[in-house]
Amino acid sequence: MAPSQDLGERDQQQPPAPYPADLENGRYGRIPNGHGSTTGTEGSGTLQLNEKDDATLRPNGSHDVKEEGQETSTNVVDWDGPDDPANPQNWTLSKKWLNISVVGLITFNVPLASSMFAPAVPQLLQDFHTDNASLSTFVVSVYILGLAAGPLILAPMSELYGRLNVYHVGNVLFIIFTVACGLATNINMLVAFRFLAGLVGAAPIAIGAGTIADVTNLQQRGTAMSIWSLGPLLGPSIGPVIGGFLAQAAGWRWIFWLLAIIAGAVAIISFFVLQETHAPTLLKRKTNRLRKETGNMALRSKLDTQLPPKEMFLRAIVRPCKMLLFSPVCLILSFYSAFVYALIYFMFSTFSFIFKASYGFNQGTVGLVYLACGIGMLLGLGIQQLTGDRIRQRLADKRNGGDHKPEYRFPPMFMAGGLLPAGLFMYGWAVQHHVQWAVPLLGTLIAGIGICIISICINTYLVDTFTMYAASALAASAVLRSVFAAVLPLFALQMYNKLGLGWGNSLLAFVGLGMWPITFLFFVHGEKLRKNPKFQIKF
């Protein structure tokens, strides 16, 4: 009989995990090392799976596992060998990238809705007969609060019902609540439906990284994470350009009609293209099918935790919170990522007022201001793509015999961490002294380069470090990031009124300078920190 595998105990894990840790060359497949065992590394420890020589693989994908101390065997359903095409890790490259691209498209559409409405806020306030500046900012920010709450619910749902169902249901509900925003008759209705749209729209942000980890290996992951990360970064930059001209031409309600149309098109594409990637869900379906075909109700999935759905759901909700509270790696890097991401909305929430007052831009042209930061992010993506994997491989070959370490993702941040505050200084003081409008836009472009590279490097590092719990790690980061992005802009106008545009942006730049050393510290000491027994989390 084919070898069966017993999961060794891990110091960061106390009951059985929802699914095993990623192995070096495949997430759920077996990789014999020629010595009767299989090993794989993960950020905080080593996973060992010992094979028994007296087991043979059955043609239907199930095999007998005889647990130590037991006299009877249990029928366990696994993949049909390490090359099983049903395993998402073994999909063809075209199939992998098609699914990743569609997930990236959904991820782009959701942040697009967050800022597309920003240039139309003055028009909205006029229609609803209010001049409350804080309320105008909150109408934009409340959507981000929905994005903050969503991952805590949607990520656990994907573990219970699969990633595909969460994507599809999220797409449909997002369309419904977006249409409701366009039909709002008062500002309270608009705020409520904006929050709900953000809540259900958070699906790709909550589980997108998990989907990527499901289908990619180490060599493919950097590019895939760059594509996925571009949505949350570039969407907020492009949205105001479209929203500004659309509001000027057809009114603010048409912004929501357009978003609903785009979301509808994306939902249709997703319905026909996306496939399930969550291995526990796939093996559960295979188990149910084999039970019907064979009549053997004793069959169970190799990845079945045998936990009640309620307990699985609660554990999955708690896991991101535990990561933020007890993992310095997750907490510190998520805090850095949250600050960087919040800067996008901090600047964007004030562009309409600043460039109208200081440079006389109208409602349509002020939307173009947001594009400079977006161009910077595209440049940052190009730099990351050209340098990230090359530097990682060079460091692996030179320092670690060709083996990758998550810390090798950090070098592009050495430059990016300095570009971010430099761009903020340039933007703030150029606007303060009414320097020609191209100069402050150049500052936002430079800041955009830094924001993009920092965000991609941190996201990819978290996936490399918490491969088994990549979705939870990114959900934890997304929650903190969205809270920062929703709350900090509420104080933007007050800060600028007290400190001025020059010193106000300088304050943000000094905070960025203070965080810059985090990159170097993690590059040198990150491995010791994530492997320190004090910080091993038990789930």
From Swiss-Prot:
Cellular compartments per GO CC: plasma membrane
Listed Low complexity bias regions: 36-46
Keyword annotations of the record: Cell membrane, Glycoprotein, Membrane, Transmembrane, Transmembrane helix, Transport
Record's subcellular location: Cell membrane
GO MF terms, alphabetically ordered: transmembrane transporter activity
Residues with glycosylation annotation: N60, N90, N99, N132
Membrane topology: Multi-pass membrane protein
Protein's UniProt keywords contain Signal: no
Entry function: Efflux pump that might be required for efficient secretion of radicicol or other secondary metabolies produced by the radicicol gene cluster.
Family statement drawn from the similarity comment of this UniProt entry: Belongs to the major facilitator superfamily.
Record protein name field: Efflux pump rdc3
Source species of the chain: Metacordyceps chlamydosporia
